[in-house]
Amino acid sequence: MKKAFRKIHLWLSVPFGLIITVICFSGAALVFEDEVMELCRRDLYYVEKVSGAPLPVEYLIEKVSETLPDGVAVTGISISSDAERACRVSLSKPRRASVYVDQYTGEVKGRYERAPFFLTMFRLHRWLLDSMKPDGGIFWGKMVVGVSTLMFVFVLISGIVIWWPRTKKALKNSLKIVADKGRLRFWHDLHVAGGMYALVLLLAMALTGLTWSFPWYRAGFYKVFGVEAKQGTGHHDAPQATATSYACWQQVYEELKERNDGYKQITVSNGSATISFERFGNQRASDRYTFNPSNGEITGTALYKDADASGKIRGWIYSVHVGSWGGMFTRVLTFIAALLGGTLPLTGYYLWIRRIGRKAKAAPNR
């Protein structure tokens, strides 16, 4: 049986290996994007000085609105529990546009823009730099990433079968990476032992990542957890610039702040608000509220703990995929696993080429 799995392992790895390397390395580059950006652009994300009480929300929105072109409006404001973090003000367009404002001075600090490096890494990771066709044609980049990720799952599973040791002693030896017995031994150990150390996280990343590639897979994945997958339209419209009264947003913020100890961030928009918390597990978990835009009265509450599986699964998939479910510890492990995943095809190619070379040298002597 192992002979058959060796062939599967080899002939799936050879055509898809380099693509898997690109997917893994670009994914690793994205793990600490937020931390890198906050380190490089501290002037944007943090206030210069915490001084006195923050200015009213309505005043901050007014200061931001003065800088906006016609047709663009404020659609929401996010306020962190960290007094040193600047407020993030969301805009109606373009999609996901926002600016940061100092809540103590009213200074508009600048517009959020994803760094070109991380934008490239994201597009490489998801679509191999391809773009969705406006006429609805085949999205080849997304397709190739999806197929390669699916093949990677089979490569990992076949690798387990090939590697599985027969004795405890063999198990112990097969998990060692020896660096002082030649290059070939080192690359072999890195491929075999490194793959085993990263196996569980690589499988988790691949199996969750496939939900973004294939609707049929997403439907099946959701069904395993008893959830019906919602069909997306393939695009998202930016929030519309509508007439909004911001006068009661401060009242909503103050009330929700009072109700929720230990919150991470409160986001208020027109008629709704969300509260996120610094917890392990689903990093997209949030409590949701609705309010009367005319007077700020809270009219509805939807707590995350009361939501059914359909309201939780997407956030869990994302949290497992990026490794954020267990905080910094699991993110570091995910980063290392992604790097190891990227090296597996490279070390595999090296070992395969060496094997071909040895066979070619041995052939004339037969």
Provide a role label for each language-model segment.
Residues M1-R366:
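Conserved histidines in hydrophobic membrane contexts and catalytic metal-binding motifs
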